[in-house]
Amino acid sequence: MAKFELPNLPTADDAL
């Protein structure tokens, strides 16, 4: 999971 300096939001990467 590529976690950048962004808030914990439901992204496509998180759905995987």
From Swiss-Prot:
EC number: 1.15.1.1
GO terms assigned for molecular function: metal ion binding; superoxide dismutase activity
Reactions accelerated catalytically: 2 superoxide + 2 H(+) = H2O2 + O2
Signals that turn on the gene: Repressed by acid stress.
Cofactor-binding details, from the entry: Binds 1 Mn(2+) or Fe(2+) ion per subunit.
Spans through the membrane: none
Cofactor dependency: Mn(2+); Fe(2+)
This protein's UniProt keywords: Iron, Manganese, Metal-binding, Oxidoreductase
Enzyme class label: oxidoreductase
Function summary: Destroys superoxide anion radicals which are normally produced within the cells and which are toxic to biological systems.
Subunit description: Homodimer.
Similarity remark: Belongs to the iron/manganese superoxide dismutase family.
Protein name: Superoxide dismutase [Mn/Fe]
Species annotation: Bacillus cereus
